[in-house]
Amino acid sequence: MAKKSMIAREVKRKKLVKKYAAKRKSLLDEFNAAKDPMERLEIHRKIQGLPRNSAPNRVRNRCWATGKPRGVYRDFGLCRNQLRQRAHNGELPGVVKSSW
């Protein structure tokens, strides 16, 4: 189980990403459309002025059951251990043990 502070930090990051997504996208579109280097520099400074945790690449996928940051399957949002345990218990519909 991950520390509660780490889980809370990730929740905060997700909220910030959602809050600033439109502003960040509009600034990036302006940046890509700008031709003048000075104009690009000014827009870049505005992008840098946004909160650091509002960047989507800072969000880490975590298991929703345990909060573990590694070995998380995107389709289920579960870490590998929880995925295996819940699949064996039949809690994940459509997931069957492989045999050939």
From Swiss-Prot:
Family (UniProt): Belongs to the universal ribosomal protein uS14 family.
An example Gene Ontology molecular-function term: structural constituent of ribosome
GO-annotated cellular components: cytoplasm; small ribosomal subunit
Keyword Ribonucleoprotein attributed: yes
Keyword NADP recorded: no
Function recorded in the entry: Binds 16S rRNA, required for the assembly of 30S particles and may also be responsible for determining the conformation of the 16S rRNA at the A site.
Species in which this protein is naturally found: Prochlorococcus marinus (strain MIT 9215)
Protein name (Swiss-Prot/TrEMBL): Small ribosomal subunit protein uS14
